[in-house]
Amino acid sequence: MKKLLFFTFLILVIGIPSVYAHPFLLDSEPSQAASAPIGTTQIITKYSEAVEIDFSELKVFDSDGNQVDNRDTTYYDGENSLLITTPPLEDGVYTVTSMVLSKVDGHLVLAAIMFGVGEAKVDTSLLESQEESETTFLPEAAARFPGIVGQTVVLGSAIVAIAIWGTRQKYFGKDNLTLISKTYHSKFSKVTGIALVSVLVSNFIMIAVQTVRLETSPLDVLGTTFGATWLMRMILTIVLLGIWFWMERKSRLTGKKHVPMLIASLVLIFTTTLLGHGTATELAAPMILDYVHSLLSSVWIGGVIFLAFVVLPTLAKLDWIDK
């Protein structure tokens, strides 16, 4: 059995390709510091993952800082590469600036390359200051964090409630069961309610931050892949809130009544996978591992929170009754 698990793990590790954190610039034609022939009319850039063409742009500048391209950035060979055309370039040094929006997680990445045309040579000392940068800022990280924590608590609570709490209620005895169930119901509703509100607030902040980042309207953001995933996440959050209100009206929460919340939560964490970088590989294995990681984190972290803020206070109520 151990050998089987080892070989399964080995196959997964070997079979998974490198995953980049963002759409970094991998290569270009002409390449960094290269010499291109006089009359060059196009520049091609290649990235580590797919980019959104509507919010991605290449610009070409001459040594005097004048923009000399035709402002016609387009896909070249698939969604991982861009092309821009120029009038026939003359002898000189040119700079290409790249601003691309990830089609996976909605991150903006900036980069630049320099190349010479004809006899012109690139000053290599200038290349030392050239580096890619991701235009992230604190509000984006703050926007996603409460949503991740909230979904972890909801899913972990649903799993532990079904696996442990739902099967142990029969041991409390008929005399104590009514009061215990009432206490459990109150604690469960409070914890999962706060978690779902965190997810909802996080969703609104995420779309607001992305709107500001792209300097566009929320409707335009919804037209991106990030926007489609956000919309799916928002719908699932509303569904979960509906399930929460339905559970709130029940007099007693049995194990089966937690199942709808469990199913919706399992789908909700899949949206986190869709915004993860394993999705950029377009392969099943990285996506599965990312999803399993989110699932196990929910069982562990969400389960601990459920035990600490729902189960233990409920059992403390039982101790008080016995006294």
Give residue spans per PLM region:
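Bacterial N-terminal signal peptides that target proteins for export
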Residues: 1-5
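Hydrophobic core residues within well-ordered beta-strands of beta-rich domains
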Residues: 41-43, 94
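Polytopic transmembrane helical bundles with strong interfacial aromatic enrichment
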Residues: 24, 56, 72-73, 78-91, ...
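Short, solvent-exposed loop/linker segments at the N-terminal edge
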Residues: 34-39
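Bacterial N-terminal signal peptides
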Residues: 7-16
